[in-house]
């Protein structure tokens, strides 16, 4: 939201360049992006960790950062979603009439009051649509949780479906995989129902 606001509602220098640079990560496949983060933040031989251990004289063979955690997966997935979020929110800012914010300012409202009383209510449908999109993308995403989560045996919904159909011992459990897939469908339907109620 902040990046979209800066590019669409302020006169910062090179804002067109900033808007284009935000979209560059969309050109990189998510699996390749996850591999790049592994090269940087692998706890044993990631470039950032090796440099930090040598700079600060840390005696540990691992860390200080570990990409193979749930927070690491959230970090990488979150960065992957920034360009999409920017596109959705920036389009909403672009379509909104700036004179509404100007009238609020002329009525004596400060920036925070204008944001809470004018900007956010107008942008609520776009913000909710973006939120629903991101929740569904995160739930169904497999490549980043697969690469980062398999190593640490962290299972999320998408990887749990994979493990149910690729059992290490015995036959695949297609019933469990179907039930887990139905959870994604139920979540998507509930989000759409909530969107209809709130907009």
Question: Where does each model-flagged region fall?
Answer:
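Membrane-water interface segments at the C-terminal ends of transmembrane alpha-helices
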Residues: 1-94, 122-143, 147, 177-196
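Short helix-to-coil transition segments within interhelical loops
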Residues: 10, 96-123
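Short amphipathic alpha-helical coupling elements at transmembrane boundaries
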Residues: 19-22, 50-57, 98-106, 117, ...
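Amphipathic alpha-helical segments in well-structured domains
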Residues: 21, 48-49, 112, 154, ...
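Membrane-interface segments at the starts/ends of alpha-helical transmembrane spans
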Residues: 61-66, 163-175
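Glycine-rich helix-loop "coupling/hinge" segments at transmembrane-helix boundaries
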Residues: 143-170
């Amino acid at each position: 939201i902040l990046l979209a606001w800066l590019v669409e509602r302020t006169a910062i220098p090179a804002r067109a360049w900033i808007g284009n640079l935000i979209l560059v990560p969309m050109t990189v496949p998510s699996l390749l992006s996850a591999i790049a983060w592994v090269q940087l933040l692998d706890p044993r031989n990631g470039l950032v960790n090796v440099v930090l251990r040598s700079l600060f004289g840390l005696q540990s063979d691992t860390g200080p950062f570990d990409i193979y955690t749930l927070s690491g997966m959230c970090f990488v997935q979150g960065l992957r979603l920034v360009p999409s979020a920017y596109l959705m929110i920036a389009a909403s800012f672009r379509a909104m009439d700036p004179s509404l914010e100007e009238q609020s300012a002329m009525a004596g409202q400060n920036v925070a009051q204008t944001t809470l009383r004018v900007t956010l209510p107008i942008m609520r449908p776009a913000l909710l649509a973006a939120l629903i999109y991101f929740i569904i993308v995160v739930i169904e995403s497999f490549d980043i949780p697969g690469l980062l989560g398999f190593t640490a045996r962290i299972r999320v919904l998408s990887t749990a479906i994979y493990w149910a159909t690729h059992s290490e011992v015995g036959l695949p459990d297609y019933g469990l995989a179907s039930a887990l897939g139905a959870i994604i469908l139920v979540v998507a339907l509930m989000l759409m129902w909530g969107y209809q109620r709130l907009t």
